[in-house]
Amino acid sequence: MKAIYDLPAPAKLNLFLHITGRREDGYHLLQSVFMLIDWCDTLHVELRSDGQLSREDLTTELPPDDLVLRAARALQAHAAPGQGAHIGIAKQVPAQAGMGGGSSDAATCLLALNRLWGLDLPLSRLAEIGVQLGADVPFFLGGRNAWVEGIGEKIRPVDIPSARFVVAKPPQGLDTKLIFSAPDLQRATPVAIISGFAADSEQLEAPNPESSAFKVFDFGHNDLQPVAQRLCPAVTDAIEWLGAQGLKARMTGSGSSVFAKMPQGPQEAELAKAPPGWQVRQCSNLAVHPLWGWAT
């Protein structure tokens, strides 16, 4: 195999994000549901026989040593001498959005190079490599929507009803470290239980699926959102812009993107014109990652 093209790296939304405590080492304890959506970056990998790693930015210019190159370098330690790769990245998922774009790119890179180089490393080993790159990388490697706990290391797959969403990303970004270090961050939300999320098979087969879907997508809140709104008023602007169209929005991750579930109906809904510089997209959620099963 000399190349693999058109490899998707899907973004995620946090349906809720609770901070339930803080460890002595400073890491925050969280609970969240990570949901894959069809807003994707695209990677292309080509085999190099000189042992070199190179990257080509096909859309947005990326930092010289981004997560993709770091992922490739970490995996290359398991490759045969002389195995290298040229990696092309077409970015579509915005940065500083709370959508996991960089982590998803790293996960897709690991899955792709594991196959390109014929390494056949198991998913558990890839996850060990991935967690050193970022806490969200193992989720994307796992390939399923998930209930996430601890500092992000406890991942349990969950089923989520199919739904459509509108995601709005204002041009301003947010520094995750600033949010987590804020003195007014809520760090004591009571621990929830997965059954309270109501995303089990019995709920999915309920007579009124819209009712059960509402429970799933309206569960909990995002503890990071009040701090983010204080630091970045554009988050509030985005929530209010969606609210003016009858959509109940909340922030994903540490922002600055916000999202809202769309009512059942046509594939594409008519939305008001977004302010200049905003990225707005209507998305569907995914049951599994497009590369699910590439490592087991």
Swiss-Prot record:
Reactions it catalyzes: 4-CDP-2-C-methyl-D-erythritol + ATP = 4-CDP-2-C-methyl-D-erythritol 2-phosphate + ADP + H(+)
One GO-annotated biological process of the protein: terpenoid biosynthetic process
Q: Which residues bind ATP?
A: 94-104
- Which NCBIfam families does its entry note? ispE
Keyword presence, Iron: no
Give this protein's Gene Ontology molecular function annotations.
4-(cytidine 5'-diphospho)-2-C-methyl-D-erythritol kinase activity; ATP binding
Q: What is its EC number?
A: 2.7.1.148
- Family from the record: Belongs to the GHMP kinase family. IspE subfamily.
Q: Which domain of life is it from?
A: Bacteria
Tell me the lineage of the source organism.
Answer: Bacteria, Pseudomonadati, Pseudomonadota, Betaproteobacteria, Burkholderiales
Q: Quote the Pfam families the UniProt record gives.
A: GHMP_kinases_C, GHMP_kinases_N
Q: Which species expresses this protein natively?
A: Variovorax paradoxus (strain S110)
Catalytic positions are 12, 136
Ordered alphabetically, the record's keywords are: ATP-binding, Isoprene biosynthesis, Kinase, Nucleotide-binding, Transferase
Metabolic or biological pathway: Isoprenoid biosynthesis; isopentenyl diphosphate biosynthesis via DXP pathway; isopentenyl diphosphate from 1-deoxy-D-xylulose 5-phosphate: step 3/6
Summarize the protein's role: Catalyzes the phosphorylation of the position 2 hydroxy group of 4-diphosphocytidyl-2C-methyl-D-erythritol.
- Protein name according to UniProt: 4-diphosphocytidyl-2-C-methyl-D-erythritol kinase
InterPro entries attached to this UniProt entry: GHMP_kinase_C_dom, GHMP_kinase_C_sf, GHMP_kinase_N_dom, IspE, Ribosomal_Su5_D2-typ_SF, Ribsml_uS5_D2-typ_fold_subgr
